[in-house]
Amino acid sequence: MNSLLMITACLVLFGTVWAKEGYLVNKSTGCKYGCFWLGKNENCDMECKAKNQGGSYGYCYSFACWCEGLPDSTPTYPLPNKSCSKK
């Protein structure tokens, strides 16, 4: 029983340690989600935790939303074969 608990704890730890992080990206433009209030930022945190993103925490870093705890399925900046096209 103790072995099962240890294995479960290790799997949870690996999931937390190996979780994806990066800048949130707009899939249609290829640009990062921008922000102005550096550090703790409610908008970035809300965007990162949104159902379609699945992150655990977000904050403003270098004037863009940085997310932690993202699932592998969530795209982050830069997108392959797509550069940021500001028009």
From Swiss-Prot:
Expressed by the venom gland. Its main location: secreted. GO terms for molecular function: sodium channel inhibitor activity; toxin activity. Residues 1-19 form the signal peptide. Keywords: Disulfide bond, Ion channel impairing toxin, Neurotoxin, Secreted, Signal, Toxin, Voltage-gated sodium channel impairing toxin. Disulfide bonds join C31-C84, C35-C60, C44-C65, C48-C67. InterPro entries: LCN-type_CS_alpha_beta_dom, Scorpion_toxin-like, Scorpion_toxin-like_sf, Scorpion_toxinL, Scorpion_toxinL/defensin. It is found in: Secreted. It holds the Pfam family Toxin_3. It comes from Centruroides limpidus. Beta toxins bind voltage-independently at site-4 of sodium channels (Nav) and shift the voltage of activation toward more negative potentials thereby affecting sodium channel activation and promoting spontaneous and repetitive firing. It comes from the Eukaryota. PROSITE patterns: LCN_CSAB. One of its GO terms (biological process) is defense response. GO terms for cellular component: extracellular region. SUPFAM superfamilies: Scorpion toxin-like (SSF57095). Residues 86-87 form a propeptide. Belongs to the long (4 C-C) scorpion toxin superfamily. Sodium channel inhibitor family. Beta subfamily. This is Toxin Cll5c. Residues 20-85 form the LCN-type CS-alpha/beta domain. Has the structural arrangement of an alpha-helix connected to antiparallel beta-sheets by disulfide bonds (CS-alpha/beta). The keyword Signal applies. Transmembrane segments: none annotated.
